[in-house]
Amino acid sequence: MPPRCPFLRHLFFLLLLLSPWIMSPCGGAADDVTYPIVPSSPGRRSILQIRREPPTEPNTKLVVDRDGKVFLKQQPKETPYWSFSTGSPMHSLYQAPANNNTENATEITRPHIIVEYLNNSKAATTVDGYHNWTVQEFFRQKPLVTDDGVTLGSETTSAYLVDGRSGRLIHVYKSTGDTKITNALVKPASTEDFVNEPLLIRRTDSKLEHFSKTTGKLVWNLTVSHFRAALLCDPVFNSGYDLGPKLQTGIYMPLLCGSQIDVRGPEIVIRVLHDQPMNVKMLPSPSLNHFESENSIMPFGKARESRKLQEQHKQKYTYLFGQWSPVKLLAPLVLLGVVVSVFIKKFSSRGSDVSLKAGPSKKKKNRKSAKDTNRQSVPRGQDQFELIEGGQMLLGFNNFQSGATDGRKIGKLFLSSKEIAKGSNGTVVFEGIYEGRPVAVKRLVRSHHEVAFKEIQNLIASDQHTNIIRWYGVEYDQDFVYLSLERCTCSLDDLIKSYLEFSMTKVLENNDSTEGVAAYKIQLDSLEGVIKGNNFWKVGGHPSPLMLKLMRDIVCGIVHLHELGIVHRDLKPQNVLISKDMTLSAKLSDMGISKRMSRDMSSLGHLATGSGSSGWQAPEQLLQGRQTRAVDMFSLGCVIFYTITGCKHPFGDDLERDVNIVKNKVDLFLVEHVPEASDLISRLLNPDPDLRPSATEVLLHPMFWNSEMRLSFLRDASDRVELENREADSEILKAMESTAPVAIGGKWDEKLEPVFITNIGRYRRYKYDSIRDLLRVIRNKLNHHRELPPEIQELVGTVPEGFDEYFAVRFPKLLIEVYRVISLHCREEEVFRKYFKCDII
């Protein structure tokens, strides 16, 4: 017998001694008294505190009335706690006027359809000549062909983001894109944009339209609305006992955080004339799922199912142990656990001794830690609100089946162990697959759930924009929150460094190990397909059209965020991601510390929580001053400088940047060869936030103009100053000519070829120190390019790119100096509005 058998024998005798005491009841029938199972979720009391009040039902409920107004009501008195309107009634019915003027008309035609609301105590009555349908039965029949026409169905969805505590309407999402209705519904709010209990009410309007088979005209249409609610907060906000977050003392939300429920409304019966058959010649089409069955779209929240499971546990508990005192039950179980743990310890130690003596194993086995096992066994909280796309909530199981073993499944997410990037506060980004699509999985420590859900809220608000990273869903386990985000190729920082072939000597100078160098080579190799065939700089260091396009993408993303009232607050090259489709595009990401301002707010105040990254923050952020949208514009200036100069910073090296930002010690020498960039960056880095341009103004800056627009502006400017009289002391002409030393740098004929000067001298005389005369030359040669001699055409190049480059190389500061004068004196004139107004460009 093996040496550990005596220990097993002792354990067996001990269990025999304990078994009579364990199995004998204290008296009384086992079915008389039951004890509820205590949930083992974090933050609740231990099993020693098992005596507690039984869980109570929610004392509030969400309902909707006939007018489409959603209420949170306290039970049992049905007292409204808050309410908001969704803008239109629950149902609408239109019936075309009947034609009763024909010769055969003997009686007034009855309506095809009658819609009736039922009270709780009223049953659906029958009406002669009509057949009663429930909403589910009626809408399940679409589309169809009847003897008198065709019935078609459609569906639109709206989502209303509400503060669950106050009922304040935060935002409206409409699949129809009706921004006028959206703006009319949302009232300005002065409170903090982030709320702990964001409640999303989804309204689905299902519409049937019946058209006459003979005339093709609309006979009738019927629209009925269905409401669904999802509470988007983290489950840690739940109050326990299967109750949602507490609104005030004794009042709780009717659903748990992360769950969804139907919003109940008045019951409707639809009466249809018998001569309107509803069950013939069905046309193939997807049904209106939310009318098929309540569980086919979204099961009810966890509260109801968990109570059923709890009742089953209570029965098993009573049947197995009888009417036992919890303390008497606990003592032998604890003792038994101690004995078993001692046994396991001895067994494992002896087993390890044997394995050491036997030598190393020939076959390694994959073993998972207890922590990983727990993560895999953690049930998926409740019906999670996974995805908003085009205003609709998309649910369902993930059909993805991966043969990969290097990862694990969390709800709908397959999380790979391959790490993409690391961030602050324990944030790590992994590869993953969510509902069959490759995603980047941002893993945040669960204690930072506010950051995660704030990021989700702002990603939802800014969804569907090509320059904002897409959010697909969220999953949880015991320790982390997992955000499934759009998968991109690399960051802007990686792209620039890879393109410049960030040398190995630079890596070695930073004291990286040989392994680090090897890893960086792998990174460069992985991006070779992205940078191959793309040019980011022209000869001479000017940004290429592709680089300008990427920087314009960044600005477009900021414009979109600022229009929504969202301030990013952490803009830097690492948070700009690059996506490769037909061409490269830039997308803003990492909105964990972003803030959303209501419409009547101009700033975030002096104590806005969270801070951006060192070296990329505006001075008012570093000094904890009043923060506005201008903080993003300062960071944008640093990013543009960093991109154009190839990873250089306008405020110096890493350690000195914050100090230099506060002292306004900026060095723009490296971009002075690109005057348009130098002008824009200097304005963006202005220490006074009120003097920085807005995102829309940046988008219209000459730095982002193409050759055609640059030439068009110079031609319009020439036309404008051509009629000005020098003797009349023209302000605009004086301002224009005063910039000549900078814009021209001497006499402009000295910078043009003799053959070109000879050609223009045939027609008129010019003043070679005058900007007006130089603009006249550019305008005339541009307007008559086809009539120029072949040698002159070859010299100035093709229109517009070649022609623009010819003069831009010789007079690099001409455009920006003329732009400044026109901006100051003529920006409101009709001819120049397209260069300064976003609604025109």
From Swiss-Prot:
Induction annotation: By ER stress inducer tunicamycin, by salicylic acid (SA) and by bacterial pathogen infection.
Membrane-spanning parts: 324-344
Boundaries of every KEN domain copy: 707-838
Residues annotated as the enzyme's active site: 570 (proton acceptor)
Required cofactor names: Mg(2+)
GO cellular component: endoplasmic reticulum; extrinsic component of endoplasmic reticulum membrane; secretory vesicle
Biological processes annotated in GO: defense response to bacterium; endoplasmic reticulum unfolded protein response; immune system process; mRNA processing; protein autophosphorylation; response to endoplasmic reticulum stress; response to salicylic acid; RNA splicing
SMART domains given in the database record: PUG, S_TKc
Annotated protein name in UniProt: Serine/threonine-protein kinase/endoribonuclease IRE1a
Organism: Arabidopsis thaliana
Gene label: IRE1A
